Amino acid sequence: MSLLTEVETYVLSIVPSGPLKAEIAQRLEDVFAGKNTDLEVLMEWLKTRPILSPLTKGILGFVFTLTVPSERGLQRRRFVQNALNGNGDPNNMDRAVKLYRKLKREITFHGAKEVALSYSTGALASCMGLIYNRMGTVTTEVAFGLVCATCEQIADSQHRSHRQMVTTINPLIRHENRMVLASTTAKAMEQMAGSSEQAAEAMEVASQARQMVHAMRTIGTHPSSSAGLRDDLLENLQAYQKRMGVQMQRFK
């Protein structure tokens, strides 16, 4: 796996699924391929994106700044600085300075990542802030190691939280989670179907599923009534793709 592929993988792992994630993935690909060369426009676009947490925006802004060539005097962006200040905690800043001194001695991406993984997310963010604000300099490779370590920690905590929700025995939470997943799957089906004649059936299935979820929420139903709803939708989507000549493994 190339360095930039690895960076893209880690960064995208902390972005919530949805149309915005696909858009960000495209921007990252363009930036890494040297296609998107106006940092000012890119940062303005990032600043106005909805849904993303300030820290995720800060990390993406840091990655864009590392990758896109820019004039030396280009102003640093406040939304990135605020996200990478470690919540203003002086302890985070102290640890960030210690980490920075260690990173100065590293020359490889993996070496930097290993060193960074032993620090808290707050300290890692503060260290990125130091580098972003030009208070310290490291090689791009080392900076990317710091980025990936931060993303790994965030993704770990998100995964723990997700696992807790999936394994919860509370039937109401499981019921709502199944309905949310069915609804987002239906939305994805509608987007993928496009406007071809064969798409009418897939659109109809997706529309019915969304109406069903809407009705279930409106009248309130037994928590077990949503079981299998998303799986049925995915089976329909696979059947549609087969008819369209697209062979895909089921994505569960």
From Swiss-Prot:
One of its GO terms (molecular function) is structural constituent of virion. SUPFAM superfamilies: Influenza virus matrix protein M1. GO terms for biological process: viral budding from plasma membrane. Disulfide bonds: none annotated. Residues 1-164 are annotated as: Membrane-binding. Residues 165-252 are annotated as: RNP-binding. Keywords: Host nucleus, Membrane, RNA-binding, Viral matrix protein, Virion. It is a peripheral membrane protein. InterPro entries: Flu_matrix_M1 (IPR036039), Flu_matrix_M1_C (IPR013188), Flu_matrix_M1_N (IPR001561), Flu_matrix_M1_N_sub1 (IPR015423), Flu_matrix_M1_N_sub2 (IPR015799), INFV_M1 (IPR037533). GO terms for cellular component: host cell nucleus; membrane; virion membrane. A motif (Nuclear localization signal) lies at residues 101-105. Transmembrane segments: none annotated. It is found in: Virion membrane; Host nucleus. Plays critical roles in virus replication, from virus entry and uncoating to assembly and budding of the virus particle. M1 binding to ribonucleocapsids (RNPs) in nucleus seems to inhibit viral transcription. Interaction of viral NEP with M1-RNP is thought to promote nuclear export of the complex, which is targeted to the virion assembly site at the apical plasma membrane in polarized epithelial cells. Interactions with NA and HA may bring M1, a non-raft-associated protein, into lipid rafts. Forms a continuous shell on the inner side of the lipid bilayer in virion, where it binds the RNP. Most abundant protein in virion. When expressed alone can form virus-like particles in transfected cells. Homodimer and homomultimer. Interacts with NEP. Binds ribonucleocapsid by both interacting with genomic RNA and NP protein. May interact with HA and NA. Cannot bind NP without genomic RNA. Belongs to the influenza viruses Matrix protein M1 family. This is Matrix protein 1. It comes from Influenza A virus (strain A/Chicken/Pennsylvania/1/1983 H5N2). The lineage of its organism: Viruses, Riboviria, Orthornavirae, Negarnaviricota, Polyploviricotina. The gene is M.
